[in-house]
Amino acid sequence: MLSGFLDEKYGFLPVLIPITEPAVGYGAAVGLAFLSRPLGEARAGFGRPDITIAGGLGTENGSWGVLVGDVRHWFDDRLETQVGFTHMSANLDFHGIGQDARLDDHPLRYNLEPTGGVVRAKYRLGDSTFWAGLGYAFAVTRVTFDAPAGTPGLPDFTRDSKVGGLTPSFTYDTRDNLFTPLRGTFVEALVGVFDPALGSDDEFQRVQVIAIQYVPLLRTLYFGLRADGAATFGDAPFYLRPFITLRGAPIMRYQGDEVAQIEAELRWQFWNRFSAVGFAGFGAAWNDFERLHNTQTIVTGGFGVRYEIARKYGIHMGIDLAFAPDNTAVYIQVGSAWARP
């Protein structure tokens, strides 16, 4: 029934997602998602739906934000455009870049308030599942720390700063479904080049490579594996250094100049539209390759349940309970935990 409603001319999916992220506390995100199916049958890597979403969020520690985004396909699925805008105010704890014993038990409280947007276009190479892309990202960010100047562990930062840069990318995508894939591969290499000539206060570069594989093991048993790494070079602001994003790891808790992580997931569709999920991951963050002894590492794992709320679109929704050495977290999932447009 939900799939049929989404297929209507003005069909939309109301979104109400509880937030249980350890870094910001309990809260909720609300919004509307408009989906339109392409003409004809979708096949692996082709026939993606257009998606428009608008929403907002708030949490118990005073963090809040609003966002709008649109993913659209043109010229018989040869061109994909992505446009997004957000304004947020997030109250977070700074634990250092890499391992910093001074901040392990006494992190520094700060507020991060970015306002910005991104535009991106990806062009399909021939009739293949390879895409070449180019984007531009810009944001104005205000940073305030509760700690006074000279506090041990306080990072170098500018209260008000701008970042602007080009983000070329190369993507290979054969997933059979955008929301909850059963099979296929997603690999993307993304480079960010930020420079004063492009609107940035600082000159730095950021590189990220992510690979995701989905494999059906049996008719009702599906395996997924995600591995990715990221690195920054130059004078990147501390809040743009990469961080571990495993389920169970608080947002921006494990940061470094370089980050690598891997996560595996097994989903068993045991009855009708219901599934059980188990997952485990490992991540590492460090400052540079010459000081690997300062590496922060984390092992996570957990389990969850899913229900297929829109069969035509392959949208599964559910809840995950994740465990880490110093934390237990609950996540509400709409689609894959590793969703990529």
Indicate where each model-derived feature is located.
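Short, well-ordered amphipathic alpha-helices
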Residues: 30-37, 68-70, 168-174, 209-213, ...
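C-terminal soluble interaction/assembly domains
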Residues: 287-288, 293-296, 307-309
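Small/polar glycine-rich anion-binding or flexible loop at a beta-alpha turn
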Residues: 280-284, 294-300, 321-323
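C-terminal outer-membrane beta-barrel translocator/porin domains of Gram-negative envelope proteins
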Residues: 155-159, 163-288, 337
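Gram-negative/organellar outer-membrane beta-barrel architecture
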Residues: 4-12, 20-162, 256-259, 315-316, ...
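Membrane-embedded beta-strand positions of outer-membrane beta-barrel proteins
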Residues: 14-16, 52-56, 81-85, 132-136, ...
